[in-house]
UniProtKB/Swiss-Prot annotation:
Native source species: Streptococcus pyogenes serotype M3 (strain ATCC BAA-595 / MGAS315)
Name listed for the protein in its UniProt record: Galactose-6-phosphate isomerase subunit LacB 1
The family this protein is said to belong to: Belongs to the LacAB/RpiB family.
UniProt-listed GO biological process terms: D-allose catabolic process; galactose catabolic process; lactose catabolic process via tagatose-6-phosphate; pentose-phosphate shunt, non-oxidative branch
SUBUNIT field: Heteromultimeric protein consisting of LacA and LacB.
GO MF entries: galactose-6-phosphate isomerase activity; ribose-5-phosphate isomerase activity
Group of enzyme by EC: isomerase
Gene responsible for this protein: lacB1
Length: 171
């Protein structure tokens, strides 16, 4: 299984700990950065993780920023992503089993590394429970997404992504 992971500069150490944990469990980790503590912004990393999951390059994603709020909002803007910001096992399992979440988000300064690893492990192992009710809920979420599919400026991230491709991971 391939897991995409991304973070901002505030939680690089926490992301590396999670990445090492996932590798120790035998998962392939695709690390979308950031890789140091130079100031950067989470939307790029949420976008990268989300696009990897939607395209099939990764099976699931993990997004981490200081509180988790920003990067989780960013990744949820990628069409086809259902990400849950969690800090406990119950929420993570509900997200996967009932809403078929494909990305999990954390506040790396809110949730400790060991707890994040335990939650991620349970999230990965949990299975979506396909019921008529769950399918209807997911369809309603997808409808909201498709209803607003036309971005005002589809090239908004182009400059940032070009910098990324050149190895410039910060402002």
């Amino acid at each position: 299984m391939k897991i995409a992971i991304g973070c901002d500069h505030i939680v690089t150490n926490e992301k590396m700990a999670v990445s090492d944990f996932l590798k120790s469990k035998g998962y392939d980790v695709i690390d979308y950065g950031t890789y140091d503590h130079t100031r950067t912004h989470y939307p790029i990393f949420g976008k990268k993780v989300g696009e990897a999951v939607v395209s099939g390059q990764a099976d699931l994603g993990v997004c981490i920023c200081g509180t988790g709020v920003g990067i989780n909002n960013a990744v949820n803007k990628v069409p086809g992503i259902r990400s849950a910001l969690v800090r406990d096992m119950t929420t993570a399992l509900y997200a996967k089993e009932e809403l078929n979440a494909n990305v999990i988000g954390f506040g790396g300064k809110i949730t400790g590394e060991l707890l994040m690893c335990d939650i991620i492990d349970a999230f990965i192992k949990a299975e979506y429970k396909e019921t008529e009710e769950n399918k209807k809920l997911i369809a309603k979420i997808a409808h909201l997404e498709s209803h607003h599919a036309n971005q005002e400026d589809p090239d908004f991230f182009t400059e940032f992504l070009e910098k990324w491709d050149r190895g410039e991971y910060h402002d």
